[in-house]
A protein has these predicted regions:
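Bacterial N-terminal signal peptides that target proteins for export
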Residues: 1-9
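Transmembrane beta-barrel domains of Gram-negative outer membranes and organellar outer membranes
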Residues: 23-207, 211-302
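Bacterial N-terminal signal peptides
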Residues: 8-18
Length: 302
């Protein structure tokens, strides 16, 4: 599967399903989960495309596609299932001597196997795997000063298995036109594409953002990610720290919605604890990049 086929398949799914949709959902942020859940018995289709682009040098393009169905089990409990696919293209994108040795550049990064010749380009695409998701809303931001929810997502994939949990926080202001939201994200992972195919990692992220509805159907805002990576499970031995920030834009029509967002990695990221090979130019690499773009489209099915 090439990147063009991946995009074409996603667009075909969106176009085909759009013909039968008669209502609209909301997803105002790019990466932050909110507490706007599907009501009991409602189903929504969502397609996400994320592109991570540009590392220390050369070229690095990592596209991930997530095709999702969400279902409201109750008014406060939503479940979902994903099919995940990917496209990775890397060529001389690393510059750190700990990764490249005597060569000024080499090919590396998330998805590039340890067995790959770092002097040559790498390109691969395919179905990554699947995910399940559950969100439980404890308090509703529409009726309470602060909305609180819990999120759990196991993922099984070709490149990694992961168990991710989130604490979801949200407050609405100015007749719900202004949304402030935050996620505390904790994840344990096992990477399959490097070393023996069973490499543990963990992650702690803080996501914060704001979105303001400035016109009918239109919202815009900003979101930030404060990222921490660890080389062992359960947040032991920190190896990365980085900060990302950027704008988002959201449009909601009667029978569909779309959100686009961009995050830029600020200079000042650091690597430590044996993870120094993943850093250069005051930024962290691995699965990260200078620019991260995301587009999400949603259509309720009933």
């Amino acid at each position: 599967m090439t990147i063009n086929r991946l995009l074409a398949f996603s667009l075909l799914l969106v176009a085909t399903l759009h013909c039968s949709f008669v209502h609209a959902g909301e997803g105002a942020f790019g990466w932050i989960y909110t507490l706007d859940l599907q009501p009991k018995g409602k189903v929504e289709f969502e397609q996400r495309l994320q592109l991570n682009q540009q590392q220390a040098a050369g070229t690095y393009d990592a596209l991930t596609a997530r095709t999702e169905l969400e279902y409201g089990l109750t008014n406060d409990l939503q479940v979902a299932g994903y099919i995940n696919s990917y496209y990775t293209s890397a060529n001389q994108n690393y510059t750190n001597p700990e990764a490249c040795g005597d060569s000024p550049t080499c090919t590396g990064g998330y998805g590039v196997p340890s067995s790959h010749d770092p002097s040559t380009a790498y390109k691969k695409s395919g179905i990554e795997g699947g995910s399940l998701e559950a969100i439980y809303r404890i308090t509703n931001p529409v009726t309470s000063p602060v909305g609180v929810g819990l999120y759990l997502e196991p993922t099984w994939g070709r490149n990694k298995d992961e168990l991710e949990a989130r604490l979801l926080l949200q407050s609405n202001f100015i007749d719900d036109r202004l949304i402030l939201a935050g996620n505390v994200v904790v994840a344990n992972e096992r990477l399959k594409f490097i070393e023996n195919g069973n490499v543990p990692e963990s992650m702690l992220d803080f996501l914060v953002g704001a979105s303001y509805r400035f016109a009918p159907k239109w919202s815009a805002g900003v979101e930030a990610r404060f990222h921490n990576d660890y080389s062992e499970l359960n947040l032991r031995n920190q190896v990365q720290r980085a900060t990302f920030i950027g704008p988002n834009m959201h449009y909601a029509a009667k029978d569909w919605w779309v959100t686009g967002a961009w995050r830029y990695q600020l200079a000042g990221g650091t690597c430590m604890g044996g993870g120094e090979a993943e850093c250069s130019n005051a930024r962290v690499w691995d699965s990260h990049s200078v620019n991260e773009f995301i587009v999400k489209v949603g259509f309720p099915l009933n």
